[in-house]
Amino acid sequence: MLAKPAAQFTLEEAQAEVEKLRKQLNQWRLEYYTKDAPTVTDNVYDDHYRDLQALEEAYPKLVTPDSPTQEVGDVINSDFAKVQHPIPMLSMGDVFSFEELSEWDARMQSNVGHPVDYNVELKIDGLALSLIYENGKLVQGSTRGDGNVGEDVTRNVLTIASVPKQLKQPLSLEVRGECYMPKAAFAKLNARQETEGGTPFANPRNAAAGSLRQLDAKVTAARELDTFIYTLIEPEQFNVTTQHEAIAFMQALGFTTNPSSEVAGDMQAIDTYIKKYTTDRDALPYGIDGIVLKVNDLALQAQLGNTVKVPRWEIAYKFPPEEAETVIHDIVWTVGRTGVVTPTAVMDPVQLAGTTVARATLHNADMIRDKDIRIGDTVMLHKAGDIIPEVSRVLVAKRPVDTPPAPIPEACPSCGQKLVHLDDEVALRCINPMCPAQVQEQLTHFASRNAMNIDGLGPKIVAQLQAKHLVKDVADLYHLTAADLAKLDKFKEKSINNLLSAINNSRQNSVERLIFGLGIRHVGGKAARILAEHFGDLDHLMTASQEAIADVPNIGPTIAEAIVTYFKAATVQKLITQLREADVNLRYTGPTKPVVKDSFVAGKTVVITGKFAEFSRPALTKQLEGLGAKVTGSVSKKTDLLIAGDAAGSKLAKAQSLNVPIMNETELLANLKD
């Protein structure tokens, strides 16, 4: 919350606070949308976002196009082909109380001059998805991306059972909806992640996003994603006049639509709907985080239009977080793979959002101090993203007399070494490279599916190997023998042979798996692949300068600094030597990006307008991008070529005024044949 009302800030104070809020929000957006690994709850993000909105409303001159309040959605992932959305996929405005929702309805009625019917829908907690069909056949699936340009995830969408590959009628159309992960599938996925030494997903939304954006469609297929479709683009083509009719029309074509949508003509009906699903949401097999109101009349939707970021004809009501009261009996500190020491509250078991909760993350020492959380305190819990239990506040009035502040450790709970703060980070960290807890986490991570993929080497086996002093680092894995493994509990000949075979097979992995498996700070699987493909082998990466690494697309200075620091360590250099001597592959042997041959559009910025006899616009866009073109949605001085079909309209006129070269469909076909 702001220290005072936005209108009481001086311009200088407001500017400083705006810059601070934008920096923080952009970091959280990166974690949420691109890394699929949020570090704060939706409520914390929303509070900061509304503070920024308030300051920008008080001082409009501080609004910039790159402000989080002006941008839509995700940062584009360079691993996927880009898709230009012919009609932008906008975000959605939101409110956080029924009073705010009623005020929005009053403004709506005032604007249009009469009462408004709304189609009321559940707000599915997932990832926005666009599907394009030609003659009834699915030809493209894409994410929202930044609203104008998304990611082509067609191969992954084809693995989702609820997405029809062929419609019940041979129609050409675009629909939009939500890709989500059911609660049961999320529980199975996180159980598998933990068994294989991976990091559990924070919530089903991030699990869905991470699963849909997999480079390997087989991984997506195993994640049990589902969809609800709720938007029909250009419905007038099909004589559909209301949102409720659109949902019925899409359902008749074979799409899965949510059965809970209904038309409401007044706020009393909407209030009843909200109360019903506030109560029943935990019983649903999928996550929802609110209710969506959409003007039901599609012609009125078109009349109301959009702002830069959101439609004026729809709004989301966000549920308040559900809370439960409990007592903290202990705070335990655990050491992670990178040495970060994290506190967890151990509490009386309590029912919260449909599950029994007995532990909750406290994140870091600063949170314990800021909220003054003490052992013995009565606290209120909520579930961040409806999944992760967190302490929302302390009920100080119920605190026992003379309860001391919670002790913050000065030494590592695993190895006893003094804990430190690196740079200006909040986390406490153990920097002992031989810390047993870290080594166990590192070994488990190294063997995980997305790293070296050593099947059968999970946390329990790693713990046994450590306890029997058979391994002290990842290089030791490659010196294990059948006699060594025979010392493990319940390890017979078959298990021994399977594990030795998996370890031996991992020697041949392309080096990006090794880079990821080493657990370098900030280096995830995608960054590891980019680095491996760019440098070709580990030796070139190890000897590259920080500047050279930072210049690699999508890497940047933070990752570059972490890599240089990591490989400077004598213990790391010794480890790499040992891996080399164990015949572990250090070269990139994965697929390389195809080089686009010279074509009439290679490297050019192209705009498409009008209707074509031989192409749909999405198919033509995809074909031109495959030839090396950058296809955009508007004509400017930077446009190299306009491809104009029939009824080209204003884009053709603008291109002519700017002397942009223009190509018709006949000329286009001739060029494509060359």
Swiss-Prot record:
Its EC number is 6.5.1.2. GO terms for molecular function: DNA binding; DNA ligase (NAD+) activity; metal ion binding. It comes from the Bacteria. Zn(2+) binds at residues 412, 415, 430, 435. GO terms for biological process: DNA repair; DNA replication. The keyword Chaperone does not apply. NAD(+) binds at residues 42-46, 91-92, 121, 144, 178, 294, 318. Keywords: DNA damage, DNA repair, DNA replication, Ligase, Magnesium, Manganese, Metal-binding, NAD, Zinc. The active site is at residue 123. GO terms for cellular component: cytosol. Its cofactor is Mg(2+); Mn(2+). DNA ligase that catalyzes the formation of phosphodiester linkages between 5'-phosphoryl and 3'-hydroxyl groups in double-stranded DNA using NAD as a coenzyme and as the energy source for the reaction. It is essential for DNA replication and repair of damaged DNA. Belongs to the NAD-dependent DNA ligase family. LigA subfamily. NCBIfam families: dnlj, PRK07956.1. PANTHER family: CHROMOSOME TRANSMISSION FIDELITY FACTOR 18 (PTHR23389), DNA LIGASE (PTHR23389:SF9). This is DNA ligase. The lineage of its organism: Bacteria, Bacillati, Bacillota, Bacilli, Lactobacillales. The gene is ligA.
